[in-house]
Curated annotation (Swiss-Prot):
<dbReference type="InterPro" id="IPR007112">
    <property type="entry name" value="Expansin/allergen_DPBB_dom"/>
</dbReference>
<dbReference type="InterPro" id="IPR002963">
    <property type="entry name" value="Expansin"/>
</dbReference>
<dbReference type="GO" id="GO:0016020">
    <property type="term" value="C:membrane"/>
</dbReference>
<dbReference type="Pfam" id="PF03330">
    <property type="entry name" value="DPBB_1"/>
</dbReference>
<dbReference type="InterPro" id="IPR007117">
    <property type="entry name" value="Expansin_CBD"/>
</dbReference>
<feature type="domain" description="Expansin-like CBD">
    <location>
        <begin position="177"/>
        <end position="258"/>
    </location>
</feature>
<protein>
    <recommendedName>
        <fullName>Expansin-A29</fullName>
    </recommendedName>
</protein>
<dbReference type="Pfam" id="PF01357">
    <property type="entry name" value="Expansin_C"/>
</dbReference>
<dbReference type="GO" id="GO:0005576">
    <property type="term" value="C:extracellular region"/>
</dbReference>
<comment type="function">
    <text>May cause loosening and extension of plant cell walls by disrupting non-covalent bonding between cellulose microfibrils and matrix glucans. No enzymatic activity has been found. May be required for rapid internodal elongation in deepwater rice during submergence.</text>
</comment>
<dbReference type="GO" id="GO:0009828">
    <property type="term" value="P:plant-type cell wall loosening"/>
</dbReference>
<keyword id="KW-0961">Cell wall biogenesis/degradation</keyword>
<comment type="similarity">
    <text>Belongs to the expansin family. Expansin A subfamily.</text>
</comment>
<feature type="domain" description="Expansin-like EG45">
    <location>
        <begin position="52"/>
        <end position="167"/>
    </location>
</feature>
<keyword id="KW-0134">Cell wall</keyword>
<dbReference type="InterPro" id="IPR036908">
    <property type="entry name" value="RlpA-like_sf"/>
</dbReference>
<keyword id="KW-0732">Signal</keyword>
Length: 263
């Protein structure tokens, strides 16, 4: 009887240890601390001028990002590695009580790049010059925290978990021997650190993809006629395998929605 109890205790301990290990290796994305920056706006009152952008998301309305988006300065954009990240911003009413909406806040998704303008001083028009942390926000988002006539306001900002509806989506573009995969609707960290692809043919292994631009990842393999799986690692270290998310009948230009999402 004592022997059985001992075996049960060992099994229970091992099971608990495995569960604990899983929970510590895959933790939910947590918000960062607050930092100071500045914010302007662009794109018009309906944000129609924000479509496209350096992340490659295209139509932000149909992609689900809407009008709460922003172009990031060089210091924040990180050559596209920040595409899809979410930031909470609040206007610093103590620093600018005239143009700030005190107590208001808004969360935006990084969808574009705000290029530097070295012809202008960083504190007088060159708002996106390094090393300034600056957000050029879609106008509807900016007007939630600032008064239109102000034009530019001081802000406090921090990264926060992205909340998305549905699973991660993959749009396959390109041509033979050049698959360009746009990754959208990423929750939690919002941005992708690395990505791999595997075809469905027997013996196929995982092949590393590289960031082409923005949220677009490329492969130089010949994958036509194969079902595709992706192994995606977000910038917080979470990894998900999207097994068979793209069927063998895929064609360039199609988008495939998964049922899996980051936490």
């Amino acid at each position: 009887m004592a022997r059985r109890g001992h075996v049960f205790a060992v099994v229970a301990f091992v099971s608990y240890a495995l569960l604990a290990a899983a929970s510590t290796t895959v933790e939910a994305f947590a918000a960062s601390g607050w930092s100071k920056g500045t914010a302007t706006f662009y794109g018009g009152s309906d944000a129609s001028g924000t479509m496209g952008g350096a992340c490659g998301y295209g139509n932000l309305y149909t992609q689900g990002y809407g009008t709460r988006t922003a172009a990031l300065s060089t210091a924040l954009f990180d050559d596209g590695a920040s595409c899809g990240q979410c930031y909470a911003l609040t206007c610093d009413a103590r620093a600018d009580p005239r143009w700030c909406r005190a107590g208001a806040s808004v969360t935006v998704t990084a969808t574009n790049f705000c290029p530097p303008n070295y012809a202008l001083p960083s504190d007088d028009g060159g708002w996106c010059n390094p090393p300034r942390p600056h957000f050029d926000m879609a106008q509807p988002a900016w007007e939630r925290i600032g008064v239109y006539r102000g034009g530019i306001v001081p802000v406090a900002f921090r990264r926060v978990p992205c909340r998305r509806r549905g699973g991660v989506r993959f749009t396959v573009a390109g041509r033979d021997y050049f698959e360009l995969v746009l990754v959208t609707n990423v929750a939690a960290a919002g941005s992708v650190r690395s990505m791999e692809v595997r075809g469905s043919r027997r013996g196929a292994g995982w092949m590393a993809m590289s960031r082409n631009w923005g949220a677009n990842w490329q492969s130089l393999a010949y994958l036509d006629g194969q079902g595709l799986s992706f192994r995606v690692t977000a910038t917080d270290g979470q990894t998900i395998v999207f097994a068979g998310v793209v069927p063998p009948s895929w064609r360039f230009g199609q988008t495939f929605a998964s049922t899996q999402q980051f936490m």
